[in-house]
């Protein structure tokens, strides 16, 4: 199975997500409007699918969902390399390979959900931008998994950049620049 074969953006999983988005609510749910684009991690997506502050809220939500899904897809391809190599052998048990891939996708989705929710604790209290949310994602994951062996943070940074989500107030998009820093002096305890 090649990377293209396992591209989640063109699989049944994405179709299920879109179907769920259509049926989950009235109007334009973000999942219904998500447009995922395959490509190199540093290649921007079509301008029509990039972040634009003038877009309607659901369309902006779709950009955020697409960026996160793009990052998850890249990590999935990385983490399943050995399973795909096994699948390429002539007598690989396809049912077992499929089960391994499904289990990895489920585990990865749970890990990404954990990062996405934990990041909320690191966001400013009001008027959060997508760039600030990326900083919160990077910080939350760095606190939980300091060494990042599977490149989750790198995948998130590349995906947000691909979808045109900018981060104000940082010199570059390195992990060190994106991490939220603690206060320079300790804050007094709250009584």
Predicted regions mapped to residue ranges:
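Zinc-dependent metallohydrolase catalytic domains
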Residues: 1-191
């Amino acid at each position: 199975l090649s990377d293209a074969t396992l591209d989640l953006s063109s699989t049944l999983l994405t179709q299920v997500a879109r179907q769920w988005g259509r049926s989950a609510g009235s109007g334009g749910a973000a999942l219904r409007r998500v447009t995922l684009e395959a490509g190199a991690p540093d290649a921007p997506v079509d301008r029509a699918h990039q972040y634009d502050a003038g877009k309607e809220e659901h369309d902006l939500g779709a950009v955020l969902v697409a960026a996160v899904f793009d990052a998850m897809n890249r990590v999935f391809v990385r983490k399943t390399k050995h399973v795909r190599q096994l699948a390429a052998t002539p007598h690989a048990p396809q049912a077992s390979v499929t089960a391994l891939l499904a289990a990895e996708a489920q585990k990865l989705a749970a890990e990404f959900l954990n990062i996405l929710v934990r990041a909320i604790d690191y966001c400013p209290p009001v008027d959060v931008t997508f760039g600030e949310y990326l900083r919160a994602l990077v910080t939350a994951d760095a606190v939980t998994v300091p060494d990042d062996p599977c490149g989750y943070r790198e995948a998130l940074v590349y995906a947000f950049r691909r979808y045109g989500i900018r981060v104000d107030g940082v010199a570059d998009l390195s992990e060190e620049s994106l991490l939220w820093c603690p206060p320079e002096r300790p804050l007094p305890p709250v009584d």
